[in-house]
Amino acid sequence: MNQTENMEGTTTVGFVCTDGVVLATETRATMGSLVANKNADKLFQIDDKIGATIAGTVSHAQSLMDILKAEISLYKLRNEKDMSIDALAVLTSNILKSRPYYVQTILAGVDKDGAKLYTLDPSGSYIPDTFTSTGSGSPYAFGVLEDRYNEDITTEEGKKIAIKAITSAMERDVYSGNNYRLGVITKDGMKIYTKEEIAQIKKQL
């Protein structure tokens, strides 16, 4: 399996709301045309009010998330304050530039300046944005986001849009499927929703 095949699967979405950020993914992991795992975790909490999604090689993604968690903890010990989302985006960019991680990630969270979101690709380039999607199912997810998203929505409204976007990708992209992961970050912290809670959100679509 080559590196391009590693990057084929996955759909993730993220966007900024008036009171925080919403992140969502599906859970299918593929190796070429094989569904290797139906419950792959692509949503991570890397600090109290910072989350990330990943698309790409699983081992690289797990390694990158572990490094970011360690760097954030070290920063807090040294500086006695939280790392900003902007600083974390720069740090992640430098890590990606220093070695070949075949990972595309969305970093998002809430800091003293409010809610922020960045998309980073394997080359280390990083882009601030209000909404985005990554992975093979992203064209379908973007269709929903372009139609439903606006910067005035709350996270309560955003949860439904995120699940709708992931559902659209799962219905059309063979590399995306199985289950959902949903996280909401506000000034109070990050909440990762259970399957039962997500099922209730789906009923409202």
UniProtKB/Swiss-Prot annotation:
Pro-peptide positions on chain: 1-9
InterPro entries: Ntn_hydrolases_N, Pept_T1A_Psome_bsu_arc, Pept_T1A_subB, Proteasome_sua/b, Proteasome_suB-type
Reaction equations catalysed: Cleavage of peptide bonds with very broad specificity
GO CC, one annotated term: proteasome core complex, beta-subunit complex
Control of this protein's activity: The formation of the proteasomal ATPase PAN-20S proteasome complex, via the docking of the C-termini of PAN into the intersubunit pockets in the alpha-rings, triggers opening of the gate for substrate entry. Interconversion between the open-gate and close-gate conformations leads to a dynamic regulation of the 20S proteasome proteolysis activity.
Keyword Protease recorded: yes
Active site: 10
Group of enzyme by EC: hydrolase
Pfam families noted in UniProt: Proteasome (PF00227)
Xref: HAMAP family: Proteasome_B_A
Protein family (similarity comment): Belongs to the peptidase T1B family.
PANTHER family: ATP-DEPENDENT PROTEASE SUBUNIT HSLV (PTHR32194:SF0), METALLOPROTEASE TLDD (PTHR32194)
This protein's name: Proteasome subunit beta
Source species: Methanosphaera stadtmanae (strain ATCC 43021 / DSM 3091 / JCM 11832 / MCB-3)
